[in-house]
Amino acid sequence: EISSVPWDCRILKDSEEEVVLKACITTLRSPFRLEKEISLKRDESAITIRESLTNLAKEPMELMWGHHPTVGKPFLDSSCRIDTNGTVGFSMDQPDFETQRLKPGTRFAWPAPGNGVDFSNVPGEDADTADMVYITGFPERAWYRVHNETKNISYGMSWDGKLFPYMWM
């Protein structure tokens, strides 16, 4: 829901040392308010995101709270490798794609399910596969990294593994 409505955004800090943006949204269909502070410090290559979610209802409400970062060309190619401290991979019970390399309902020790596939290696564009794989089994400080060997550059995230115990790959 929050990806399709405007956010209230303002710059909290804009100095040579740090830039901080605050973004807030109150959902329309459900009673929640999400606030984010996104900051970037001078000479650091990491963006920090701090979030708070408030239930505006007078009763407990269920929700799905997650993030959907994506990477693609020109960064993502067959020289990329996915590293993580998650220990368990799995697929959903229903197939997502005809070309997926995992049987539905498969659970395995990350990164290799024993079928000759190593999911830590990103397939090439011509691989003709689409896989919906989830990773869990994270410690309290969860992380993943996608490293492009050819370009010698990486992209990664770290988060509270207890608050967000699953990663969609």
What name fits each language-model region?
Residues 1, 165-169:
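Acidic-aromatic substrate-binding/catalytic surfaces of carbohydrate-active enzymes
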Residues 1-43:
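Extended, loop-rich substrate-binding clefts of extracytoplasmic carbohydrate-active enzymes
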Residues 11, 37-41, 52, 69-71, ...:
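A generic local secondary-structure boundary/capping motif
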Residues 14-16, 29, 42, 56, ...:
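Surface-exposed coil/turn segments at beta-strand junctions on protein surfaces, enriched
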Residues 21-23, 34-36, 47-49, 65-67, ...:
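Hydrophobic residues positioned within well-ordered beta-strands of beta-sheet architectures
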Residues 24-29, 52-57, 149-151:
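Secondary-structure transition/turn motif
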Residues 44-84, 158-161, 168:
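Acidic (Asp/Glu-rich), glycine- and aromatic
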Residues 73, 77-160:
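Active-site/ligand-binding surface loops and adjacent short beta/alpha elements
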